[in-house]
């Protein structure tokens, strides 16, 4: 986008990009500790409060899921940025096991010098993604802000028996991931200035593949993976998933750790499926991808699945053109943490 003769790069207007702008999990825990207490959440209609992907409230025989997600640009194209933001915002509803999103309140932060037509392109991308996923913007809020921001407050509905949380993980479960890792590193590659490109041993063809693969991942809705899970469950006539989350700013190990902590189990991650070349690039950029903490934007679902049904689940995911990586397993009860296996394998996609 251009302002007069000046080329506008959204990513140059911020210091942190996408889900990397989020508060670290330990600081987030400290922030809310003692402010929202257990007593505040005693209402029997609050089925899920803090610490999950969305809150779940029971009303008139249905459950309402509520979540909010807002972040900074990770790409320069405002339309694509809008689609990524909508994908990320809606994902937390799907990560609770619910398919029906009844509306989205768009939230936009606008720097004073950012042309309004750029903001309109972001909103257009956001709304187009919503339409593609059977929902719509129903309202929202805008503010003037030093950094551009876009996201939404999302409401989903469903039945109580459909809800999946981070707390249901069982010993013996396998963990299935529905998107590769490495979006943080891939998009950092896209921001390398022209004068420094020669310092990185990578062809233009490889660079384009890495960046386009990341954008494809960040604009692919987790709705498709959840629908595949439901189809697999219909096929076997039983529940397959014991727990569910999505992989975003805390990385695969950070989000696995939340599942392990909430379920009081030990999870071992033994596979890191990554976008091509991002493992070596992550070392160069100082990202924690190979430690399991690479910040993902609009990452995949992480499904804690019953081992006896994993082949059925993988088959339905692949039929839906989703990735299906078996990335770990639940080793034992107790400990309440996730760890990388000593012989963790890294594969490139």
Curated annotation (Swiss-Prot):
EC number of the protein: 2.7.9.3
A GO CC annotation given for this chain: cytoplasm
One Pfam short name: AIRS_C
Superkingdom of this protein's organism: Archaea
Cofactor: Mg(2+)
Keyword Kinase: yes
Residues annotated for ATP binding in this entry: 22, 50-52, 69, 92, 140-142
Main function: Synthesizes selenophosphate from selenide and ATP.
Record-linked HAMAP family: SelD (MF_00625)
PANTHER family given in the database record: INACTIVE SELENIDE, WATER DIKINASE-LIKE PROTEIN-RELATED, SELENIDE, WATER DIKINASE
Protein name: Selenide, water dikinase
């Amino acid at each position: 986008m251009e302002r007069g003769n000046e080329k506008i790069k959204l990513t140059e207007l911020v210091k942190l990009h996408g889900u990397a702008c989020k508060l670290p999990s330990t600081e987030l825990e400290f922030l809310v500790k003692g402010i929202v207490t257990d007593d505040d959440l005693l209402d029997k209609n609050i089925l899920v409060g803090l610490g999950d992907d969305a809150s779940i409230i029971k009303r008139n025989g249905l459950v309402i899921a509520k979540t909010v997600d807002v972040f900074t640009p990770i790409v320069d194209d405002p339309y694509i940025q809008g689609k990524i933001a909508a994908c990320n915002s809606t994902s937390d509803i799907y990560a609770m096991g619910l398919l029906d999103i009844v509306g989205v309140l768009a939230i936009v932060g606008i720097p004073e010098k950012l042309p309004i037509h750029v903001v309109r392109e972001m909103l257009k991308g956001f709304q187009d993604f919503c339409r593609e996923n059977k929902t719509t913007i129903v309202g929202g809020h805008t503010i003037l802000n030093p950094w551009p921001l876009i996201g939404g407050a999302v409401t989903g509905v469903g039945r109580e028996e459909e809800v999946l949380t981070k707390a249901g993980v069982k010993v013996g479960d396998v963990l299935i991931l529905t998107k590769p890792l490495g979006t943080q590193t891939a998009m950092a590659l896209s921001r390398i200035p022209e004068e420094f490109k020669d310092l990185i041993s990578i062809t233009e063809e490889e660079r384009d593949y890495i960046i386009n693969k990341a954008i494809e991942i960040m604009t692919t809705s987790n709705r498709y993976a959840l629908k595949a899970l439901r189809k697999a469950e219909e096929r076997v006539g039983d529940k397959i998933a014991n727990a569910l989350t999505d992989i975003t700013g805390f990385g695969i190990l950070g989000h696995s750790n939340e599942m392990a902590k909430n379920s009081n189990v030990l999870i071992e991650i033994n596979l890191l499926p990554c976008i091509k070349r991002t493992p070596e690039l992550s070392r160069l950029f100082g990202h924690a991808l190979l430690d399991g903490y690479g910040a993902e934007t609009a990452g995949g679902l992480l499904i804690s699945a019953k081992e006896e049904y994993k082949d059925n689940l993988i088959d339905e995911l692949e039929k839906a053109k989703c990735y299906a990586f078996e990335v770990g397993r639940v080793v034992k009860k107790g400990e309440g943490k996730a760890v990388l296996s000593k012989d963790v394998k890294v594969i490139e996609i």
